């Protein structure tokens, strides 16, 4: 995995980061998304203190991430249960078809 030095504009500041080449566009998209979220939060709350706005945006993003992790865990459990049931059914079929 080769890295590329990339300049990203985030909240009006240029950040220079070493990024895997295949992730450059995703990082740029994430930076644009962060700018939008901060602008929307400033507009919504009327706050002008960047640190407070960033704290709220970070908390919202953290909450969304937690929700997605919980959803993923539930889906994984459903899939695991389904696979176990299929394995059990296949084993029953195999045992039933074995000559005695």
Curated annotation (Swiss-Prot):
Main location: cytoplasm
Coiled-coil region: 21-45
Key word Lipid metabolism present: no
Origin superkingdom: Bacteria
Any one GO cellular component localisation term in the record: cell septum
Any single biological process term in GO: division septum assembly
Localisation: Cytoplasm
Keyword Electron transport: no
Keywords assigned: Cell cycle, Cell division, Coiled coil, Cytoplasm, Septation
Subunit structure: Homodimer. Interacts with FtsZ.
Similarity section: Belongs to the ZapA family. Type 1 subfamily.
Function: Activator of cell division through the inhibition of FtsZ GTPase activity, therefore promoting FtsZ assembly into bundles of protofilaments necessary for the formation of the division Z ring. It is recruited early at mid-cell but it is not essential for cell division.
Protein name per its UniProtKB record: Cell division protein ZapA
Gene name of this polypeptide: zapA
